Regions:
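Conserved class I S-adenosyl-L-methionine
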Residues: 1-31
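Class I SAM-dependent methyltransferase SAM/SAH-binding core
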Residues: 39-82
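A conserved beta-strand element that flanks and buttresses the S-adenosyl-L-methionine
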Residues: 94
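Short catalytic micro-motifs in class I SAM-dependent methyltransferases
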Residues: 97-98
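A short glycine-rich, Lys/Arg-flanked "PGG" loop and its adjoining helix->strand segment in the class I
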Residues: 106-119
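Conserved beta-strand signature within the Rossmann-like core of class I S-adenosyl-L-methionine
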Residues: 118-126
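Short alpha-helix
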Residues: 129-141, 154-155
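Core SAM-dependent methyltransferase catalytic element
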Residues: 149-159
């Protein structure tokens, strides 16, 4: 995650519009209540907090990005493979353009499933070296209800 530490000050300038576009697409398709709890795995600077009008939490391994995210929502430093939350703690779990960075993506998917109660949005970078393997892992771990093609990602809406 050294790359993200190095670009942390310019992260939003580089990725804001792209990430907000994905987040808007996710919000349009995922029905949520103000009482719902949303977990953003690989939250970066916490852009998801700008759109979801409910309880939000973020987790990311990069300390420098979390320094920005914690101004927007509660955060924890950690990896997707070892989420520091209780089982079934979140109504919605999102993981946008992060899965390809996991050391063990399958374990990360199982962790998301463990802490979620049934609504998931996971995007996979189309140019990820392991794209096909990641798609298979998501399909094996979750029931994919809808697939949306974004310019750079495939967004999977799962149960």
């Amino acid at each position: 995650m050294q790359y993200y530490a190095q670009i942390s000050q310019g992260y939003e300038e580089l990725h804001r519009d792209e990430q907000l576009g994905k987040l808007k697409a996710v919000m349009e398709r995922m029905k949520y209540e103000k009482t719902d709890k949303v977990l953003d795995v690989g939250c970066g600077t916490g852009l998801s907090s700008l759109l979801f009008q409910c309880q939000k939490f973020g987790v990311d391994p990069t300390f420098e990005l979390l320094q920005q995210a914690k101004k927007r929502m509660p955060v924890a430093q950690g990896t997707g493979e070892a989420l520091p939350f209780k089982d079934n703690a979140f109504d919605i779990v999102i993981c946008l353009t992060a899965l390809h960075n996991f050391q063990d993506p399958q374990r990360g998917l199982l962790e998301m499933k463990r802490v979620g109660t049934g609504r998931f949005a996971i995007s996979i970078l189309k140019r990820a070296k392991a794209f096909d393997a990641l798609m298979k892992m998501v399909n094996a771990t979750f029931k994919v209800k809808e697939m949306l093609e974004d310019p750079k990602d495939i967004i999977l809406f799962c149960a």
